[in-house]
């Protein structure tokens, strides 16, 4: 597993600190946003994808509550899941299927606390080779990464549109998203089931396009990108710090919603990408803290019905997702935040 550690005082562009409030956003009148009397150190898993770009600001916002965040960079959500389940991390954001996959393997130490948004995952074809409807998928060679949220959305869309996934020309792509682009350019595949910034790279380089069809609007999964989750041991021992983390997260998402272009620049800097690529990736993403429990249950059922997990955990997932911290941080009801949606 390839990880890179960053210090708790992550440096950001000067413009960010100039715009950031110097005190917690809701002021001292809200008990959930008061500064902790003693500092609490936290390890946060971070994957460098555009949908998670607001989380680059989490250390800076959490520091206002006396929570000291150290970010650890991961290349794959699966590795973040393993680290959070084991307690090597206290907080992480990964695919909405990851807590379910953990439960299927007997890991009960991860608790989902907030949503991240929608979009981000994408389909990509060579320019001029559009796929206008799902019937047009059948003859194509399709590059996928089994287990990824983009793959899950695609597999659900295939079923909902009357195709037999088992009869498709599936090509398993190993490694990172760059390998999908190489395979697509090299005509080893005709469609990549991938995610940003890799779609954005193909688009801005001029050789690729999005097909007319999309896999981000299925009844089973919807457009969910990721879930923010806590390690249960950390959550139980440090509930007040956990609340401050979620409150800080809500604050940074509000900043991202207000100024997506600013976050495109942050993402470009952190990922070492051209700003045009980052801007295209962010354009495809909608930041949102709500978390649809119905979608999570639908994902669990889909994974079981299709043999990805050996045990049906759809009836258990609710107890591994809590709206307590998010409701306090936003002042909204759990039902409004997705518990009944």
Language model feature labels by segment:
Residues 1-41, 332-341:
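Short, low-complexity disordered leader/linker segments with a strong preference
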Residues 28-177, 183-186, 190-196, 212-213, ...:
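Short, glycine-/small- and polar/acidic-enriched structural segments
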Residues 63, 103, 159, 203, ...:
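Short polybasic/polar patches that bind polyanions
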Residues 64-66, 215-221, 286-292:
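Short, solvent-exposed loop/beta-turn-alpha elements that line the ligand-binding surface or hinge
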Residues 97, 173-267:
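Pocket-lining segment of extracytoplasmic ligand-binding domains
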Residues 185-188, 284-300, 325-335:
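Short amphipathic alpha-helical segments at helix boundaries and their inter-helical linkers
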Residues 236-312:
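Secondary-structure end/capping motifs
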Residues 304-341:
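Conserved C-terminal helix/tail region of periplasmic/extracytoplasmic solute-binding proteins
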